Amino acid sequence: MLKILQARLQQYMKRELPDVQAGFRKGRGTRDQIANIGWITKEARVFQKNIYLCFIDYARAFHCVDHNKLWKILKEMGIPYHLTCLSRNLYAGLEATVRTGHAITGCFQIAKGIHQGCILSPCLFNLYAEYIMRNAGLEETQAGIKIAGRNINNLRYADDTTLMAES
């Protein structure tokens, strides 16, 4: 069942995610983004451009995904309701307790975090992170480094983001 849901979500990922996001996508890897950054810095030297790169790694990225926000994002991105419901059902009613010394706390609801190791988690995280980037105010036409007639202001691999700008 999860494989079918993953295949459906990946169809929407292909549509929604820009080519600057290489994480969790078939045929792409960290080496691609490292090579892109290397090429960009080399070209900047050739054309004597000052560029600035800011490397960001989300700490505990999968743990920070808010469930309610995720369902809203999936809806906004046009993910069909039935796919969102199936995903939501995986997280419905999750509870946990914590052992503190010799005692155990009472049960509490888990409202954040996507499952580590679940085949759906990379898709869900990519869509969540894409929403953040779309709403970060980084308009491609206004900022970034001009490459082949296009401004590129970020490169991403899963939870690693490189922001780029010229001086």
Predicted regions and their residues:
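Nucleotidyl polymerases of mobile genetic elements and RNA viruses
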Residues: 1-167
